[in-house]
C-alpha cells in the first residue's frame, strides 16, 4: 500500500475537508456521527482505514474486507472488554484519522498502549508534516473510487497540528467543540487505562493521569494559539453542555456559519438518529479523576487559560 501510494504523484487535490476538533472525550464523536448523516459528507469507514489497498472495486471485495475487519474487532473487544462502552467501532461506521497516523509512527494511540515517556515527548516536539502528506495521499487514494462533496474528518490530536493541516488542505474548515476538561480528561484517562491493560500486566494510574494532562494541555495550548490565524468563516465553536441540549439546532447554526447547505433530509436523519437512541447523550463509561491521582485543582491549574476563556 505504501509503495503504491508513494509512487503515484498524479492525484488531484482532495475535496475540501471539514475537521471536527477538540479534546478527546469532549463530544467530538457524537458531533461527528451526526454530521456524517449528511450525504454531502464522506468519512472513511473503519475497514477502509485498516484495509485500503488494493482498492476494493466490487461489492464482493468490500464485503470481504468488512467481514475481515469485524472479525478483527471481535478479537479487540475480547482483549479490551470495556471498549464497546467507551468507543463504538464497526467495520462500516465512519472512523477518525488516528489509525492513519499510526502508519507514520506518530500517533497518540501508542501512548495509550504503553508507558513510553520518551515517545510522548517525541510526539510533542517532532514535525507532523509527513503525517499530513501521508494523510492527504490516503484520501486521494479513496477518491479513486469517487470524489465526495466534502470530507468529514476527526481526530483529537488534530487540535495540535492546524498549520500542518492547512498546508495540505488550504481550504479546510474546523468545528471546535469545547467541554469542561475536568470531565473530558477523566474520561480519556479511563480510556487509556483500559487500552493499556490489554498490553501490560501492571499499570500506574497516577502516571496515566500526569501524562494525559501534560500531553493534551500541550496540544490544546498550541492549537488555541494557531487557530488565531483562522478567519470567522473557517472555524465554528460549540459548547458541549449546550450542544447536548439541542444538537440539531447547533448543527443548523454551524452550517450557516460555514456556508454549508442543510436540507430537510439531513434534518430528518439527525432527528431520527437522536430519537432512536434516547440514551445516546447518557454516558455508560464511568470514571473519576481521583482514580488517576488527579483532582479538579490539578485540571484547573493545567488548563487555566482555556477554562477561563470558555467559562468552565
Question: What residue ranges belong to the model's regions?
Answer:
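Long amphipathic N-terminal alpha/beta scaffold segment
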Residues: 1-23
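PAPS-dependent sulfation machinery
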Residues: 50-151
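Post-Walker A helix-loop "phosphate-sensing" segment adjacent to the P-loop in P-loop NTPases
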Residues: 37-47
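Conserved phosphate-donor/acceptor-positioning beta-strand/loop module used by diverse small-molecule
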Residues: 154-155, 165-190
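Flexible loop/turn segments at secondary-structure boundaries
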Residues: 158-162, 182-185, 244-247
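Short His-Asn-centered micro-motif
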Residues: 21-23, 152-156, 240
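Glycine-rich phosphate-binding P-loop
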Residues: 20-37
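PAPS-dependent sulfotransferases, especially Golgi type II membrane carbohydrate sulfotransferases
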Residues: 1, 8-9, 115-133, 142-146, ...
